[in-house]
A protein has these predicted regions:
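Adenosine-cofactor binding site in Rossmann-like domains, unifying the SAM/SAH pocket
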Residues: 30
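Helix-turn-helix
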Residues: 36
């Protein structure tokens, strides 16, 4: 049974998003089909964000970032996983993204996870963030 108030948003990392959604009983939504109504009708989000090699958000995520800025996130819980990017090059951009979400009312839950880094463990991360979603 899917928990409709939790949405896992992804771009090219669909397999990871589906694994997270299965663990949470959530639905997945492609960043390319994300819209304001989905933001308004959902309580919690897991964002599998992607960054360009030189730092900023990928173009699809830049679009969704604008959607999030245009909608109140007050009372919404957000967990952020960097599905494509690394903390050395993209860390400052990831923090800026989180700050924008906070300024718009979102409650960021858990630590930011960088997929594929040394010691990353998706199961542990999902267990850590799930009680707060």
């Amino acid at each position: 049974m899917k928990h409709e108030s939790i949405v896992v948003v992804y771009d090219s990392c669909q397999a990871i998003a589906e694994e997270i959604a299965d663990k949470l009983g959530a639905e997945t939504v492609s960043v390319q089909s994300m819209n304001i109504r989905q933001i308004e009708n959902s309580q919690s989000f897991v964002l599998a964000v992607e960054f360009q090699a030189d730092g900023p958000l990928s173009p699809h995520w830049q679009y969704v970032s604008q959607l999030f800025r245009g909608t109140s996130l007050s009372g919404k819980n957000v967990a952020v996983m960097v599905a494509l990017g690394n903390s050395l090059v993209n860390g400052i951009y990831a923090e800026a993204f989180n700050s924008e979400l906070r300024l718009n009312g979102a409650h960021i839950v858990g630590d930011q996870l960088y997929a594929g880094t040394s010691g990353w463990n998706l199961d542990n991360w999902v267990c850590a963030v799930s009680p707060n979603l």
